[in-house]
Amino acid sequence: MKQTVYTASPESQQIHVWSLNHEGTLTLVQVVDVPGQVQTMVVSPDKRYLYVGVRPEFRVLAYRIAPDDGALTFAAESALPGSPTHISTDHHGRFVFVGSYNAGNVSVTRLQDGLPVELVGVVEGLDGCHSANITPDNRTLWVPALKQDRICLFTLSDDGHLVAQEPAEVNTVEGAGPRHMVFHPNRQYAYCVNELNSSVDVWQLKNPHGEIECVQTLDMMPADFSDTRWAADIHITPDGRHLYACDRTASLITVFSVSEDGSVLSVEGFQPTEAQPRGFNIDNSGKYLIAAGQKSHHIAVYEITGTQGLLTEKGRYAVGQGPMWVVVNAY
């Protein structure tokens, strides 16, 4: 298995393309100059394209991924109705979802042969929209509205339109600020990191009709932490055993173990990391975690070790200015 790591640096308008070997070492393959401040990225389900959100001219860009080394070639672009904060796709590679914090909306763009071709629809009124997350069954889109302390639930129609479910939303505790999410591999649980109080909520998917319930809320900060809380990103290992979330003020990654059924998280430790970690990701083997320091202008590679999933630093690498997003592709 070959793996490529992509890092987005908006201040220098660059994507760095890295090869990740089995020992956790990165080798630079390419530096791509992007026509705009690159914000958020996602790899297509068939692993052939990288979709990138840019500003100040709000667009989604599509880059072809070379099958031999992961290098990028520009392929297409499509306009967006707001500054892209988070980008994702459905599991069949038919649609791109873009959440916009500043515009307070989520948009759907149709893909044809892997390329963005037209805007299907926009849902407004999502104050502080920070991500769009399709459920494993490809039926429901979860959209956290950070400023409203709610997660909105939409059914994805066959033609890409979003229809509010019943109930249409679930609420977090006041002042939590739901931000990013991941789903457990068993499809029964989801985990949401809350930006404003640096907590993680565990949501149980109770039935196929979209009914969900919060079954646990866990503080992700050390007991003696007294500064402003500012959580950012969250990811789970492919085997569902370990979960990680980062806080930008503390510049740390919190390590969680996950119960066998996915219902319970336990804090295992705290890993100091690059300054102001805005984004990170986990490789497809579940062996390495790559974190980006928005203020250090570096990325760091950690090995995930032991039964607790603690992190051991393997190396750090200079990237562009203000790196904020990391994605990993395996092929």
Curated annotation (Swiss-Prot):
The reaction(s) this protein catalyses? 6-phospho-D-glucono-1,5-lactone + H2O = 6-phospho-D-gluconate + H(+)
Span-the-membrane segments of this chain are: none
A GO term, aspect molecular function:
6-phosphogluconolactonase activity
Q: Does the keyword DNA-binding apply?
A: no
Q: In which pathway does it act?
A: Carbohydrate degradation; pentose phosphate pathway; D-ribulose 5-phosphate from D-glucose 6-phosphate (oxidative stage): step 2/3
The residue range of the signal peptide is none
Kindly give the SUPFAM superfamilies that the UniProt entry links to this protein.
Nitrous oxide reductase, N-terminal domain (SSF50974)
Q: What is this protein called?
A: 6-phosphogluconolactonase
